């Protein structure tokens, strides 16, 4: 028995080392490639360096200009990054739209930024990049646990080559949210409910959609106990940590005198709460009427594609992952933008990590692998360029 336990520990250690090595390969490849691409784009097509409230909203942050600093750092001073930096340095604006952003990421930026000499952009990028690396390791471990190592290897590449994957390397919440979400589900599958609850809480303090982790975690907890109430223990309370994060944020906003979330979205983000099918129908109608911008078309296509993958997830993966995908999509579709109906969905679908596991399963076939990789890489290059040039992507 001791020999078997020792062997199991050694094999687990080797597997973890393999996960780290492979994650580093993917991370370094993507980091160098996209940084080089961003630098080349700005070198070939310099953009105006003066802030513009509509075209280049730096929100009071001084643009990084000139030399390698602009090519390596200034290229990532874009859109939501500026909101996070503003919150980190000046706090929430009582009459501004940035109060819809949960506090964990900007607070982390503030703490690390102060520790490294008030270099807040470097802090923001460091946090998101470390989270991206950690997310890759956990995605590999989770997929290997559920399937096999080759599928795990492909899943890391597929999510990293997705057309909007550059957001995982930017100063955005995509990577931290995915890290906490995958960790919550990974720990739940292993029955480590206290740790799973902590990760779910952190996820909901990073992104509002983290609250829906309650549903897959509750299902997984009940399934592990054969859906029999006599098998329930106090550890089951950990599944409530995800909505606790959202409720805490709502209470924080209330006592600080901010408008309710719904009003803030309506006034500052031109977004209204709707039933999920309403936003999808409105986006579809806009497309059929020929009024969709290119970004809108991409958002719509990705939504339909990931809805399809959600259906497949219920058939090919443990049910907890299908529930996670379904509830997340319903949450994301519960708002509609007056200008771009599904605004940001091409970015938001990155959080649907089980979809990339499904693609990795399909990618066992060499032709399917090429059909996934080639279009993804081409779109990734194009959309990264759009982002760097202050073009709206999501």
List PLM regions with ranges.
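Transmembrane-helix signature of polytopic, membrane-embedded enzymes
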Residues: 119-123, 139-161, 179, 320-323
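Signature aromatic-anchored transmembrane alpha helix within multi-pass, membrane-resident enzymes
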Residues: 239-243, 365-394
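Specific aromatic-rich, kink-prone transmembrane helix
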Residues: 138-141, 158-161, 176-195, 355
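Short hydrophobic/aromatic helix or loop-helix immediately within or flanking a transmembrane segment
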Residues: 75-118
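Transmembrane-helix motifs of polytopic, lipid-linked glycan transferases
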Residues: 110-111, 123-146, 307-312
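Transmembrane and membrane-interface helices of multi-pass
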Residues: 143-147, 151-164, 168-171, 185-189, ...
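Short acidic/glycine- and proline-prone juxtamembrane loop motifs at membrane-interface regions
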Residues: 169-176, 345
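Membrane-lumen/periplasm interface segments of specific transmembrane helices
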Residues: 33-51, 76, 202-203, 210, ...
